């Protein structure tokens, strides 16, 4: 979309019948996505909390993996502390923000909340001091539910993207369509970690920190 690369003009269009129809279809699609995603996420939580005390892989179904700590560049404080250098090294980008009016919100069920709380209390054992959980009928059934939802979700996610893109084309250079959507695009100055490292490695190091290692849970698809 060519309009994604330019600032909006601040104008809001009046909605046409075509735009109202797209909006209605988009909300219906999002309603379906929420329903399927809830089924998928619930199955995932049940797999993850099968061992109530520890993080455990389930043979052939799901596993945990360690993610290396990522570097974090404190752009906000660097800009405050060194505005002149920021100005010299920065470049302009368009920051888009697309939102749907009368959008749908997902409400977590009590079962969902309880499983999340249970997972919060689980512990990760660094040493491989226990085996993976063996598959059983219940676990295979849960995995099948997750897989079914995973496959079912994809065409609706694609449809959602296509409908959103249709609205963006109709918005064009404007800021949005009244009661339908908003697509704000503003210029913003940006700086990269690599640009600062090339300019002054010692200064850059003061604004680069290492985050905490993360544990990621993955279900086999």
Label the model's feature ranges.
Residues 2-28, 34-221:
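Extended, charge-rich alpha-helical segments
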